[in-house]
Design a protein with these regions (language model features):
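C-terminal output helix
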Residues: 28-37
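His/Asp/Glu-rich, glycine-adjacent segments
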Residues: 47-118, 124, 128, 168-175, ...
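Segments forming glycine/polar-rich beta-alpha architectures that bind adenosine-containing cofactors
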Residues: 128-191
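Flexible loop/turn segments at secondary-structure boundaries
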Residues: 8-9, 159-163, 281-285
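Alpha4 helix (beta4-alpha4-beta5 surface) of REC/receiver domains from two-component response regulators
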Residues: 6-22
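The C-terminal output helix
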Residues: 10, 37-51
Length: 294
């Protein structure tokens, strides 16, 4: 902790550059010193206690919510609270609450499955529910009237907790707005991702665009080989003309991802660039075969 009479900005910047923990300017009263010392010595303990208290309160609130009927928006809110609290508690393993979180998540999953079974059929006819085929219309096309390039990333099999980690690295570079949509069933890649790019449900792709729908005899990855063409057909149906040719890339391993980073400046010339990040999905499917990933 640096205590000084000097209030010049250059000294403050130099002190920050030296990674000081706190900066106090004279005259200093005892309460300032006390809070600086407590933050350094007991800060983690105090934060852990506060986190524990907030989680216990949330645990009780979620337990009450699970006893009552909820709509999709309330379930989404519950899911966010569960994941975000788990994310916070991961920073404080000394609290010993991980098993409690796991148990409540399991109970929530069971109740949510029942909720989906009761309501999924109705969602298919509800225009207020954003499903996989509606993603591009709702979240991508509205940006096409802007003068700059539009990048559409699909990170297959990424969980919300994984996004929270990524978000920490992006929030200083971008203005981030989070929203949620409801995935279709089956949620497997060949169905869900084709639905996103085509704007159709899988049965409609097979009926309207049979040449772009692969049979179930193919593997999961070849069943998604026509995503660029499906997106082009969706643009045609919406009578949208791009300023440049649609660009589509699929990142199947980190090395190819690094190559794309090296060429990122050239992508700025494109009107729309769609990028599928596939290696997260491949990694998830490899867990059962790779001991280190278990």
């Amino acid at each position: 902790v640096m205590v000084t009479k000097n209030e010049t900005e250059t000294l403050m910047e130099e002190a920050i550059g030296e990674k000081i923990s706190d900066y106090l300017t004279k005259p200093v009263n005892p309460s300032q010193v006390l809070i600086a010392v407590k933050k350094l010595i007991e800060g983690r303990k105090i934060l852990g206690t506060k986190t524990s208290q907030e989680y216990i309160q949330q645990f009780n609130e979620i337990s009450r919510m699970l006893l009552n009927p909820m709509d999709l928006e309330e379930w989404t809110s519950l899911y966010r609270r569960l994941v975000e609290s788990e994310f916070e508690l991961d920073q404080h393993p000394e609290l010993g609450l991980q098993q409690t979180v796991t148990d409540q998540r399991r109970e929530s999953n069971q109740e949510f499955c029942k909720f989906v079974e009761r309501n999924y059929k109705g969602w298919l006819e509800n225009p207020d529910i954003v499903l996989s085929p509606h993603v591009v219309d709702k979240y991508v096309f509205p940006h096409l009237n802007t003068p700059g390039p539009v990048f559409f990333f699909v990170i297959d099999c990424m969980r919300y907790d994984q996004w929270l980690v990524m978000e920490q690295h992006l929030q200083d570079l971008f203005t981030i707005k989070k929203d949620f949509y409801t995935g279709i069933l089956p949620s497997a890649t060949p169905y869900a991702r084709n639905a996103i790019f085509s704007g159709y449900f899988p049965s409609d792709i097979e009926r309207v665009l049979p040449g772009l729908w692969s049979t179930g005899e193919d593997d999961d990855y070849s069943m998604n080989k026509n995503e660029k063409e499906l997106l082009e057909k969706l643009l045609e149906r919406r009578r949208i003309r791009l300023r440049t040719e649609l660009k589509y890339y699929k990142i199947i391993d980190p090395e190819y991802g690094k190559q794309m980073v090296g060429n990122i400046a050239s992508f700025a010339k494109n009107h729309v660039t769609a990028i599928v990040v596939n290696f997260v999905d491949m990694l998830a499917h490899s867990r059962s075969d790779t001991p280190i990933l278990k």
